Amino acid sequence: MSRDTDFVFTFARPIGVSDVLDALGAAGWVPDDMGSITYHIDLEDGDAQQRPMDEFPAAVAELEQGVAAGHISTIMLTWRDTGTGGSFFFYPSGDRLMLAPILNTRTRADHPDFLDLEWYMSRLLGPLAGIGLTGVETTDLA
């Protein structure tokens, strides 16, 4: 069964790409998409960029430039060594961040058709609250 799941985080003020990635990185999120960094500077152009892991600062700079130019930019992040994660969307307004959990998704043991929202929330709320998080909206639809 295909599901549409996402998390939308809102902030009190515009938050930069570096602010988000620094906070998430300190908590255990890494830009490791099977050994490389995968990101979109402009989601609308459809072409993903890939870089070696040691070129993370250059990827962040490109993401920041994309958002500053008015584009929705994304980067794949995973939780430490689990490979669980997804695509994090950065919006030009800077007051919103979205996660589409598409990599090795965690489902509930008692209801495996549903995403384990708590698994994700327990790894995201702390670091994002530290940079001004004011709200979260989740969706899990068949």
Residues covered by each model-derived region:
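Surface-exposed beta-strand edges and their flanking turn/coil or helix-capping segments
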Residues: 20-24, 46, 103, 112-115
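Charged interaction segments
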Residues: 53-142
